[in-house]
Design a protein with these regions (language model features):
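Conserved alpha/beta enzyme-core scaffold
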Residues: 1-174
Length: 174
């Protein structure tokens, strides 16, 4: 059994001061996560976003779309401070694209150019993150020659990958 990754280590070390996420704390029974502690002490800004809105903000950044409207979050604390607009009798919130300086992602396989193939839940956010970041660093289990990934299985093009790091054999997944 592996313990869940607690991203609070980045706040504890001072490497991060803001987090935009759907679930800012690990699924543990610890009394207070480091992210919560940093937020309560004023050392961190926490922006909680519904998961569907979060992935659409990331995808929009990768596609060059600066903003979009969504009905998700209307009438909740998520809507506070955001522009509201009615379309056909329904209220929507304006959400802005979310880009990153760096994306640290994981894939099953990369070819030597950086084309990526994923398995499982890695497909959920990693392809979008690669397109939305200035620099994408990917950790992979295997690096193959160009042509070693079936073209139908390439899920992120090498255009979006800047660095490849191969996981050591036997290294347990986090």
């Amino acid at each position: 059994h592996l313990d869940p990754i607690d991203h609070g280590m980045f706040f504890e070390s001072g490497q991060a001061t803001k987090i935009t996420c759907s679930f800012p704390v690990p699924g543990t029974t610890n009394p207070l996560s480091e992210i919560e502690r940093a937020w309560r002490e004023g050392r961190a800004e926490v922006d909680i976003v519904p998961q569907g809105t979060l992935i659409e903000r990331i995808r929009s950044a990768g596609a060059g779309v600066p903003a979009f409207y969504t009905p998700t979050g209307v009438g909740t604390p998520v809507a506070e401070g955001k522009e509201h607009r009615d379309f056909d009798g329904r209220t929507y919130l304006l959400e802005t694209a979310l880009s990153a300086d760096y994306a640290l992602i994981r894939a099953q396989k990369a070819d030597t150019r950086g084309n990526l193939q994923y398995t499982g839940t890695s497909r959920a956010f990693n392809p979008a993150m690669a397109t939305a970041a200035k620099v994408t660093i990917v950790e992979v289990d295997e690096i193959v020659e160009v042509g070693g990934i079936d073209p139908e299985r390439v899920e992120t093009l090498s255009t979006y990958v800047n660095r490849i790091v191969q996981r050591e054999a036997g290294d347990p997944l986090p």
